[in-house]
Amino acid sequence: MMLGVIADDFTGASDIASFLVENGLSAVQMNGVPKQPLNSRVDAIVISLKSRSNPANEAVEQSLNAYNWLQENGCTQFYFKYCSTFDSTAKGNIGPVTDALLEALNEDFTVITPALPVNGRTIFNGYLFVGEQLLSESGMKNHPITPMTDANLMRLMDAQAKGKTGLVAYADVIQGAARVKERFAELKAQGYRYAVVDAADNSQLEVLAEAVAGLKLVTGGSGLGAYIAARLSGGKKGTNAFTPTKGKTVVLSGSCSVMTNKQVEKYCEKAPHFQLDAAQAINNPNYAEELYQWVTANLDAPLAPMVYATVPPEALKAIQNEFGADKASHAIENTFAQLAAKLKRYGVTNFINAGGETSSIVVQQLGFSGFHIGKQIAPGVPWLKAVEEDIYLALKSGNFGKEDFFEYAQGMFV
């Protein structure tokens, strides 16, 4: 059986791909929907889209295109991968995409499990937690694109999907896969189309991986993907992951998450750093060139130069109020994209990126068709190597990694 993964952003794609490889599957990550058939044999194909914050109709179209290609290339079970903090409001697209994939597969039931306990994302009684905080009380309530003000996954799903969402509670999950499958049958009989499944630690994800073996569509974060991979590989562990070659390196940080703010603050103590100015990104057509000149002048420093748009919540709100959230974010993303392209032409070979939107736009601009999956820098954040040439990327979702992430990643160079 070949697993086909449809990921709604690039950091999410590398997140789940790293867990698949770590748990014994051979996998390749594709940058968007390929135009040609896959010419290598693998256990899993991960397609990375840039659809997380898109209007529902656009996300559905992208996801169905990915599904069709995966099916044509031999995949028989499909995994819709979204963020472990859900990142989808009432206007979001997780519900519509899930519905579209169910209909394409002629199926009427699937699971909703964004849990990733290794990074503090757990589900209890259908509520999503980030560490000890409810999702709605965490830093995600201030997300610039998808502010998460409700932690109840049943309500979140019902607000955006066609069907009803039920719960497989912790008390059922700890009884094992047979009981979970019984609950699936009970919920289906009661007219539920989706089941949020509690997962307070990895043992519940291991149970769920067995319970969903017969489902053609599974949805969730990378945590469940890891245990599906472990089941498919028979518990084999991946051993051939690479680390990057030392070379010209840059850090680009666009995330405004709580952890990325801490990581940026810590890195600023040791490395050359330049804070991207939103007004300049919007109004100055030469801004990317000015940033490029600064980066290239600092490439010989002991630690890589960093360009960052990362700011605390209060500063982010001020930027959004002054310029508009969409206008500011698009200008900043476009500046990062132009800068990355210039730096690649200059000879930069290692790109460390923080933030899903930043990573997505940088990868699109660099134009690679796919990536080999390397060693993990942190859970869910592997090194990637472009299939076309020796360019290495780290694509970090906002809240992933420890405070020393940027320096630690460079310590892995060989």
Swiss-Prot record:
SUPFAM superfamilies: YgbK-like (SSF142764)
Pfam families hit by this protein: NBD_C, SBD_N
Protein keywords: ATP-binding, Carbohydrate metabolism, Kinase, Nucleotide-binding, Transferase
Major enzyme class: transferase
UniProt cross-references to InterPro entries, sorted A to Z: 4-carb_acid_sugar_kinase_N (IPR010737), 4-carb_acid_sugar_kinase_N_sf (IPR037051), NBD_C (IPR031475), NBD_C_sf (IPR042213), OtnK (IPR050007)
Biological function: Catalyzes the ATP-dependent phosphorylation of 3-oxo-tetronate to 3-oxo-tetronate 4-phosphate.
Record-stated family: Belongs to the four-carbon acid sugar kinase family.
Entry protein name: 3-oxo-tetronate kinase
Species annotation: Actinobacillus succinogenes (strain ATCC 55618 / DSM 22257 / CCUG 43843 / 130Z)
Gene designation per UniProt: otnK
